């Protein structure tokens, strides 16, 4: 992973994701917020949609991507980030950057193979490319694994 440091635009994107989950947090239901910046500069946010049946849940990144397509058209994903809101009883109450799960890595790559992803990296988040986070991606119909 390249682990490039965040610039001001990246920090603003993290702040947008934090604001989204801070406004919509519901313990056991909405715990993750995401924000993406389209290639034309728009910032779109989303929060996860949890469900009693876990496999029915939808990640915050997927919600943000769906909103971006609906509201902005397919402009591509310049950068995306997800953050997790702590539960009330947790010692650390900071809203922290989290890595996208495997399914989210797949969908981010599917919608923009050149997307930048803000990920945890020790004390400070860093930027990686989706290709770095999902090497050797399977491409349907290519015979490639």
Task: State what each model feature region is.
Residues 46-49, 91:
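Short acidic, glycine/proline-rich loop/turn micro-motifs
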Residues 39, 47, 60, 120-122, ...:
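Fold-independent oxyanion-binding glycine-rich loops
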């Amino acid at each position: 992973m390249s682990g490039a440091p965040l610039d001001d635009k990246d920090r603003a994107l993290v702040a947008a994701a934090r604001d989204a989950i801070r406004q919509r947090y519901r313990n056991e239901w909405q715990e993750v917020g995401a924000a993406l910046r389209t290639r034309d500069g728009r910032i779109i946010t989303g929060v996860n949609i949890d469900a009693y049946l876990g496999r029915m849940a939808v990640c915050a990144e997927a919600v943000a991507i769906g909103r971006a397509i609906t509201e902005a058209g397919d402009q591509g994903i310049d950068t995306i980030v997800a953050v997790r809101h702590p539960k009330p009883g947790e010692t650390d109450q900071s809203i922290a950057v989290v890595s996208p799960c495997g399914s989210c890595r797949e969908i981010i790559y599917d919608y923009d193979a050149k997307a930048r992803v803000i990920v945890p990296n020790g004390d400070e988040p860093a930027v990686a490319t989706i290709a770095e986070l999902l090497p050797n991606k399977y491409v349907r119909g290519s015979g490639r694994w």
